Amino acid sequence: MLDAKYVKDNLQQVAEKLATRGYQFDIAEFEAQEQKRKHLQERTQDLQSQRNTISKEIGQKKAKGEDTSDIFAKVNQINEELKIIEKELKDLQDTINQTLLSMPNLPADDVPVGKDENDNVEIRRWGTPREFHPEAPAKDHSDIGEILKMIDFKAAAKVTGSRFMVLKNKIAKLHRALSQFMLDLHTEKHGYEELYVPYLVNNDSLYGTGQLPKFAANLFKLEGDFEYSLIPTAEVPITNLVRDEILDTETLPRYYTAHTPCFRSEAGSYGRDTKGMIRQHQFEKVELVHITTADKGEESLELLTSHAEKVLQKLNLPYRVMKLCTGDMGFSAKKTYDLEVWLPSQNTYREISSCSWCGDFQARRMKARHKNPSMKKPELVHTLNGSGLAVGRTLLAIIENYQQEDGSIMVPDALIKYMGGISVIK
């Protein structure tokens, strides 16, 4: 959530920045609402002052034994008007708050202005994509998995529906090995604290990280008496651990990681990536979250991104780093790097991680602050998050990049010990 005072003091600048994100901010309407709010507040304060004055007068008259019935009538009249105005003020404030909640984060100054993924900027590449012989082109991961009888989309469709999968045998083991490898790397080498978090969250948590109110259609909600939703990403439960907290500055930065399933309805994705494992309703991810101070926010993004990159480097998977443009960033992001892994069957790079610096945008929603003895008052923390990595997409990248002409899959060296010594899947 943007700072309301900053928005009011910089209306034109805010409107221009929001426009680069595809959000049309109606300045005239917002100013009219603000003027009305100020008028109602002033009227409320005026009536409260009148009531206080009359109350003192009542006390004085009672002390003298004088009749106060006419004054009580005035008080009742003021109270009735206050009820009406206070409700009107509350409704108007709710409308203003909903407008603020609907605004995406303002982009950092170095974020390229653009409309969509075509305007993203490549920062760097790592690794060299493998060349396949023209007579033996790269197979798609889903075809390889089905030939090996270790990926079964038909069984998943029978059990549940489309955009689900059943993994079997050594590919299921490889999927498990990947999550263990990622967690070990981040906890043992990068200094993260491992967490086990709920897979169901309440609405306050979803508001805190920015999924609500705008992205309700992307959530799977429980029916019945519980107002819970399945997590779309572990970013939600992890980041909300600091909601309504005042942290000791000395304890920052905090680095958290967790391996969880994620659930997304993929609303708006009809017809995209219908084949294979790229876009699933249920998938697993190792999430990275940083909680830090404002002066360390941007450098923390570089660090978090490097941690996600290290997974790809250890697995020897070619990738590139993209700086997202204003029109392609996530709602809560101030600046984002996407990691895109090479998929030989598609002859292109595809997203495997999105690493974002959210500034104080989420912290303001969550009332997440920090303080030390030298500070006059608590300050908002800065939050960052990224995938380190999406397990399913890493799995399919390994299947495609490590496929052999005989239909087998070589296991990356870094994973052999997690596979119990298995070096080939066939």
Swiss-Prot record:
Region (Disordered): 36-66
E.C. code: 6.1.1.11
The keyword ATP-binding appears for this protein: yes
Gene Ontology terms: biological process: selenocysteine biosynthetic process; seryl-tRNA aminoacylation
Keywords linked to the UniProt accession: Aminoacyl-tRNA synthetase, ATP-binding, Cytoplasm, Ligase, Nucleotide-binding, Protein biosynthesis
Subcellular location: Cytoplasm
Residues annotated for ATP binding in this entry: 264-266, 351-354
This protein's record includes keyword Metal-binding: no
UniProt-listed SUPFAM superfamilies: Class II aaRS and biotin synthetases, tRNA-binding arm
Cellular component annotations (GO), alphabetically ordered: cytoplasm
Any one GO molecular function term: ATP binding
List of residues binding L-serine: 233-235, 287, 387
Segments of skewed composition (Polar residues): 46-55
Record remark: domains: Consists of two distinct domains, a catalytic core and a N-terminal extension that is involved in tRNA binding.
Subunit and partners: Homodimer. The tRNA molecule binds across the dimer.
Family: Belongs to the class-II aminoacyl-tRNA synthetase family. Type-1 seryl-tRNA synthetase subfamily.
NCBIfam families on file: serS
Protein name per its UniProtKB record: Serine--tRNA ligase
Source organism: Francisella tularensis subsp. holarctica (strain LVS)
